[in-house]
A protein has these predicted regions:
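Hydrophobic membrane/lipid-contacting segments
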Residues: 2-183, 187-454, 487-519
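Conserved small-residue-rich
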Residues: 259-343, 523-561, 569, 614-641, ...
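Extended, charge-rich low-complexity regions and/or helical-solenoid scaffolds
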Residues: 454-526, 600-610, 698-705
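Solvent-exposed, low-complexity, repeat-rich "mucin-like" stalks and linkers
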Residues: 456-457, 464, 516-558, 600-646, ...
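Intrinsically disordered, low-complexity segments that are common in secreted/host-exposed effector
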Residues: 522-530, 535, 552, 571, ...
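Low-complexity "stalk/linker" and mucin-like segments enriched in Ser/Thr/Pro/Ala/Gly
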Residues: 527, 549-574, 639-664, 739-757
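A short beta-strand micro-motif common to beta-rich folds, especially ectodomain repeats
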Residues: 575-595, 599-602, 665-689, 760-785
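Disordered regulatory segments flanking catalytic cores
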Residues: 675-681, 685, 693-700, 718-721, ...
């Protein structure tokens, strides 16, 4: 049952005890779910190759200082802004950037060297996210000259990068980006939210704003209910030349109506005084008065912004022409035509109180004028016999204000006029009544004369007032469309997607409508789609059968090959090279009749599934986290492929926030072994071809050998050397054996020279080394090298023997 109807909101606004505008010039209230949908549409439609920031690389030391995350060529997605549903006193928005590409290597210090213990290759199917909070109390709201509404993110906080397991390490990653964020120019740090119509009137040009979020008090508390979390985004706007309004109380009224069947999703309030100032411009009054007053002369007073706000007349007259009223009667069987005449007169603009028009804070504009005229009236019988001759000096006091009213759902200005007149020096001369040369004593005629005499200074003055107002009323109402003026200022994107349904004027002005109703009439599906390189997907529009023109636009990737789409909406994705993780395109459908455009964002990926980390080292007493993504976002089947029967660990759903799956090593540690190497495999339940694997190297004990890089290796090669207790193994005493584990990629010689395979797309190599000791038995060690080697010179340097020449 509706309990927040449009009528109840209007009644609340009408009550003078309620502070509706809180000192702000305009308040825009939008349903939060519609705003977030609109932001997603804007995100897609504004997407371009310029949206991407340059790839980011660097090091993030983790808590304790023993480990660091080395990030390489992180590609940030365009930021997505969304409003969370909080109360007015703790309003927040969040900005999320997915990491679409790059490599992450976790480095851990081992006494005198660093080791790579984890390698992650990021793509659009699986990767971390960068999130930050915008406390809407502290983020400055900016409106540029074109009406663009922007949020300057320099005041944002709580940067979180989900590239690590603990919240402390995630914050450290976020701080890395926070510091980097500060170095960005305004063009990349200031996020454009939408557009407020700036119009052509400085008085209605937005200058700044505050954004708040509000919970719908009628929303269900049941998480399963369709209206759970329902709420609104409120934008409080200050126009140029005004001060910002006051604080927004927590108990402020929820202003989106819930009338059954109406689907209202937006309400816009305008301060009536501010709107009146914009609608009732002094210049339009001057033009109107010039058209009706003879030789109108005036002085103009300007405000500090060079805007006329007062006009005072010092010359000119208003002419009222002679009016006649026939008063026929029958006398002795004949029709006698008697006439009551009011002679014309002139009302001087400069008189007792000169005609003045002034813009005010209360009524928008007010016209005042006190003037005098001489009223001459005659009651005349045939043969020009004046039965009555009357005259009086009349003082007229005129005041006109301009409140708003709603007429046929259109906001109009209806002038409210007050005209009072008073008479002085009244002279009435009554002459004998003569008809056809004969004196007449005819009772009906005598009664008419008596009535005219009695009403001369009362009813007759009212008629004069009506004549004056009839002369002024078409000219003192400026030719302005207030509704059109409102429409100029209430669209919140370039497509003007806020549609007005109802306008009310209960003191201030209220506009009730819907956000983006066109999407219910015409939209592309799916709005976002991920597909595999070389595959085909059919896009559709609703309603089915709509006549549209399809197009595809390159955004990121190979600009020479971004696929094609036919007239039926069938999109053919390009074939991506093996070293390219993804490419992005925009699909557009343009309606042939309305010209309305609906867009979809397409991400083409090389792999059907991704599993990360590609490899990681895990102590037998600990666990390892893994995360996967599949192109269809469907259910995945997880399994462990043991390299030795009975030694493998197991998988369980992760209990960590944002976690996916946890690998648990088999325990206790196996005696006589240094390593257990398990392969983790994911397979799409609906598409067995969508498969990916990763490796977990479980250390059963601390490896005896440490593998370091020796200097002076050729391009594409690294020379490895085994160390024990900080010293290289003596080749005269120990034969070191080398072996490539996990995925075999490249080659390694008997002397430990590793050579990368040509044109490989592998992102790591695991190399084992072992030597036989006469007393201690088999001594083992390992090293993980990120590939390709040339991209990871910094990490290779950290793994090098610092004593080597």
């Amino acid at each position: 049952m509706a309990n927040n109807t449009l009528d109840s909101i209007s009644a609340w606004m009408k009550d003078p005890l309620n502070n509706v505008m809180l000192g702000w010039d305009s308040i825009v209230v939008m349903a939060r779910h519609e705003v977030n949908y609109l932001l997603r549409e804007e995100y897609i439609s504004r997407f371009s190759s310029d949206t991407y920031l340059s790839p980011i690389s660097g090091e993030v030391p983790l808590l304790g200082g023993r480990s660091k995350e080395s990030i390489h060529d992180f590609i940030l997605d365009a930021p997505r802004l969304a409003f969370s549903n909080n109360d007015l006193n703790k309003s927040h928005a969040s900005l999320t950037c997915a990491i679409l590409g790059g490599t992450q290597v976790t480095m851990t210090n081992n006494v005198d060297t660093w080791e790579a213990v984890r390698v992650i290759r990021i793509d659009p199917l699986q990767g971390p996210r960068l999130t930050l909070d915008l406390s809407l109390d502290s983020v400055p709201g900016i409106v540029d000259l074109d009406g663009g509404v922007s949020l300057d993110l320099k005041e944002s906080d709580n940067f979180i990068l989900t590239f690590a397991e603990t919240i402390d390490d995630r914050k450290l990653g976020g701080n890395f980006f926070k510091e980097w964020f500060k170095t960005l120019p305004d063009s990349q740090r200031v996020w454009t939210l939408a557009s407020i119509g700036a119009g052509n009137d400085n008085q209605m040009r937005p200058q700044s704003f505050k954004i708040r979020t509000q919970t719908n008090p009628a929303a269900s508390l049941d998480r399963a209910a369709p209206d759970y979390g329902d709420g609104a985004v409120l934008v409080f706007i200050r126009m140029q030349g005004n001060q910002e309004g006051g604080d927004i109380p927590v108990e402020y009224r929820y202003l989106i109506p819930d009338d059954a069947g109406k689907n209202y999703s937006a309400t816009v309030l305008f301060d009536a005084k501010r709107l009146a100032k914009a609608a009732l411009l002094i210049g339009s009054f001057i033009d109107a008065l010039n058209a009706v007053l003879v030789d109108f002369q005036f002085d103009t007073v300007y405000d500090t912004g060079s805007q006329a706000f007062e006009v005072i007349a010092y010359g000119g007259v208003l002419r009222i022409f002679t009016s006649e009223k026939e008063l026929p009667f029958y006398f002795e069987g004949e029709l006698v035509r008697a006439v009551f005449s009011n002679f014309g007169y002139r009302l001087p603009a400069y008189s007792i109180r000169p005609l003045m028009i002034k813009q005010t804070d209360h009524d928008g504009a007010v016209l005042t004028w006190t003037t005098t005229y001489l009223d001459l009236s005659y009651f005349t019988l045939p043969d020009n016999m004046h039965a009555l001759e009357m005259r009086q000096d009349v003082t007229v006091d005129l005041r006109c204000t301009y409140p708003f009213a709603v007429n046929n759902n259109d906001l109009v200005v209806i002038p409210v006029v007050e005209i009072t007149s008073s008479a002085a020096n009244v002279v009435i001369k009554e002459n004998p009544t003569i008809i056809n040369g004969k004196p007449v004593d005819y009772p009906p005629l005598n009664q008419q004369i008596a009535q005219l005499k009695a009403e001369y200074s009362t009813v007759n003055l009212d008629e004069h007032n009506a004549r004056i107002w009839a002369k002024l009323r078409h000219t003192l109402v400026p030719a302005v469309s207030v509704t059109s003026l409102i429409h100029e200022h209430i669209y919140f994107d370039h497509n003007r997607t806020l549609v007005v349904d109802v306008i009310r004027a209960p003191r201030d002005i209220a506009v009730f409508g819907r956000i983006n109703p066109l999407r219910a009439d015409f939209s592309i599906s799916p709005v976002e789609h991920v597909m595999v390189s070389g595959s085909v997907h059919k896009f559709v529009v609703a309603p089915a059968g709509a006549n549209v023109k399809w197009a595809v636009e390159w955004l990121q990737g190979d600009p020479e090959d971004y696929g094609a789409i036919n007239a039926a909406g069938m999109y053919y994705a390009p074939v991506l090279p093996g070293d390219t993780s993804f490419s992005r395109m925009r699909i557009t459908a343009t309606h042939s009749t309305s010209g309305f455009v609906s867009s979809a964002l397409v991400t083409v990926v090389t792999s059907q599934a991704t599993l990360n980390p590609l490899i990681q080292v895990c102590d037998v007493t600990r666990t390892a986290e893994l995360a996967a993504g599949e192109v269809s976002r469907g259910e995945l089947l997880w399994s462990v492929k043991e390299t030795a029967s009975g030694e493998g660990g197991e998988l369980r759903p992760s209990v960590l926030p944002d976690g996916d799956h946890t690998y648990i090593p088999r325990s206790p540690a196996l005696r006589g072994k240094t390593y257990v190497l398990d392969e983790i495999i994911i397979t799409s339940k609906s598409n067995p071809q969508a498969q990916a694997s990763a490796w977990v190297l479980v250390t059963q004990k601390v490896p005896f050998l440490t593998i370091k890089l020796a200097a002076n290796a050729a391009a594409g090669q690294v020379q490895l050397q085994a160390f024990a207790n900080g010293n290289p193994l003596d080749p005269t005493r120990f034969k070191v054996n080398w072996e490539i584990g996990a995925k075999v990629t490249g080659t390694i010689s008997d002397t430990g020279l590793y050579s990368v395979a040509q044109n490989t797309t592998d992102r790591f190599v695991l190399i084992f080394a072992w030597a036989q000791h006469s007393e201690l038995g088999k001594l083992e060690g390992h090293i993980i090298l990120p590939l390709p080697l040339a991209r990871f010179a910094r990490e290779l340097g950290m793994m090098s023997d610092k004593t080597a020449p």
